[in-house]
Structures are given as C-alpha cells and as structure tokens.
Amino acid sequence: MNLLKKTYVLKLYVAGNTPNSVRALKTLKNILETDFKGVYALKVIDVLQNPQLAEEDKILATPTLSKVLPPPVRKIIGDLSDREKVLIGLDLLYEEFLEREEEL
C-alpha cells in the first residue's frame, strides 16, 4: 500500500450563485468526499467577482472544473453531474484504477 498519497488540486469556476453553479459544486463535493477524501484541495472561483482569475486561466464558460495538480492540467466545461465522465475527463479514473491495482 502506498503511504504517500497524491494531493489533487482542483479549481471550480462558477458565475455567481446560479442553479448550475450550485449543482456543479454539490456534485463535485460529493465525488471528492466519496473518492478522494483527505487528498484534495478545491478552490471555488466566482468569475463575476474575480474576472481576472478567469482571464489568467483562460476560462471561457462556466461551470469549468480544472485539475491543476497532479499534471497535466485537465479541464471540464459544463455539466458535472455524471461522476464517471468527470473522473475520466480529469484523467482521475485511470489513476484511481492504477492505485487500486498496486494495493492488491
């Protein structure tokens, strides 16, 4: 068993407190607490309050989820309601599979 766990750094870009933003955050927190409890850092960025951060990271639409670490950077734009699509899109499902294989 690998005692040194990876830390996943994620940024969720939202536009205010809209239903899409609230749903994206709720779904993402559910995924993270279920599959990555204790090994993630999530920063929620409201592009209406911090447009410069969205511009720096080239965010064109919300909600956008960005996996910053571990590399490579991956982004998902739009609906985050499908757990498997989120994990595959961020290249986390494959990493999760490999880590479980190593533990066996």
From Swiss-Prot:
The lineage of its organism: Bacteria, Bacillati, Cyanobacteriota, Cyanophyceae, Oscillatoriophycideae. One of its GO terms (biological process) is circadian rhythm. Pfam families: KaiB. It comes from Picosynechococcus sp. (strain ATCC 27264 / PCC 7002 / PR-6) (Agmenellum quadruplicatum). The KaiABC complex composition changes during the circadian cycle to control KaiC phosphorylation. Complexes KaiC(6), KaiA(2-4):KaiC(6), KaiB(6):KaiC(6) and KaiC(6):KaiB(6):KaiA(12) are among the most important forms, many form cooperatively. Undergoes a major conformational rearrangment; in the free state forms homotetramers as a dimer of dimers. When bound to the CI domain of KaiC switches to a monomeric thioredoxin-fold (KaiB(fs)). KaiB(fs) binds CikA, leading it to dephosphorylate phospho-RpaA. This is Circadian clock oscillator protein KaiB. It comes from the Bacteria. Key component of the KaiABC oscillator complex, which constitutes the main circadian regulator in cyanobacteria. Complex composition changes during the circadian cycle to control KaiC phosphorylation. KaiA stimulates KaiC autophosphorylation, while KaiB sequesters KaiA, leading to KaiC autodephosphorylation. Phospho-Ser-431 KaiC accumulation triggers binding of KaiB to form the KaiB(6):KaiC(6) complex, leading to changes in output regulators CikA and SasA. KaiB switches to a thioredoxin-like fold (KaiB(fs)) when bound to KaiC. A metamorphic protein which reversibly switches between an inactive tetrameric fold and a rare, thioredoxin-like monomeric fold (KaiB(fs)). KaiB(fs) binds phospho-KaiC, KaiA and CikA. KaiA and CikA compete for binding to KaiB(fs), and KaiB(fs) and SasA compete for binding to KaiC, thus the clock oscillator and output signal pathway are tightly coupled. CDD domains: KaiB_like.
